[in-house]
């Protein structure tokens, strides 16, 4: 299967923004790539969702419910949100759904929720999904204080499961005067053995930010 698994060191680090940029760049280059986000939570009626943005990034190449089969109201890990709603997330159905997309398209970019060890089902985490799909992993991390530890832990967890690290992207998702930001890329490279591919500065306007992300990531990540 051709594609990529996008995880984060935490929630709110910009996984969806990065995934949208990668999908849009791939499609602009002539590659039929689609995103897939198995589950999203914290969905409010009438409000735009991560799945909506991913759907737009691939020009509506697949129905929204195919690109994101599970949506939950509570802003919790999918397994917990499903439990509160009396529902179950089917790991097998998700794996089958990704493989079906891979059969119809040239590449599938699968976006997790939160971090690598977030419970997707009552038994499986997102790390288990990456293993089942055989996809290499892109880690999106915060740019600021604490990211060295969070990134190192994520890289250690994926390597322990035999997963291949494609790249680390440091994303400054909000404005900050954090003094650690200039030093974190080199320190992450030292402790993980992998230099972060890019440090993405904060851009307030959403449309302009997506253009910026696309330009910074263009041609840098292969899948």
UniProtKB/Swiss-Prot annotation:
Q: Name one GO molecular function term.
A: ATP binding
Q: Which InterPro entries does the UniProt entry name for this protein?
A: DTB_synth_BioD, P-loop_NTPase
According to its UniProt record, where is this protein located? Cytoplasm
Entry keyword annotation includes Cytoplasm: yes
| Binding annotation for substrate | 41
Q: What is its main location?
A: cytoplasm
Question: What residues bind ATP, as annotated?
Answer: 50, 111-114, 171-172, 201-203, 208
Recorded GO CC terms:
cytosol
What is its pathway? Answer: Cofactor biosynthesis; biotin biosynthesis; biotin from 7,8-diaminononanoate: step 1/2
Keywords per UniProt: ATP-binding, Biotin biosynthesis, Cytoplasm, Ligase, Magnesium, Metal-binding, Nucleotide-binding
Instruction: Please write the reaction equations for the catalytic activity of this protein.
Output: (7R,8S)-7,8-diammoniononanoate + CO2 + ATP = (4R,5S)-dethiobiotin + ADP + phosphate + 3 H(+)
Return the SUPFAM superfamilies for the record.
P-loop containing nucleoside triphosphate hydrolases
Keyword Metal-binding carried by entry = yes
Q: Which residues bind Mg(2+)?
A: 16, 50, 111
Q: How does it assemble?
A: Homodimer.
Family, as annotated: Belongs to the dethiobiotin synthetase family.
The record's annotation in HAMAP family points to: BioD
Q: NCBIfam families, from UniProt?
A: bioD
Q: What is this protein called?
A: ATP-dependent dethiobiotin synthetase BioD
What species is given as this protein's source?
A: Anaeromyxobacter sp. (strain Fw109-5)
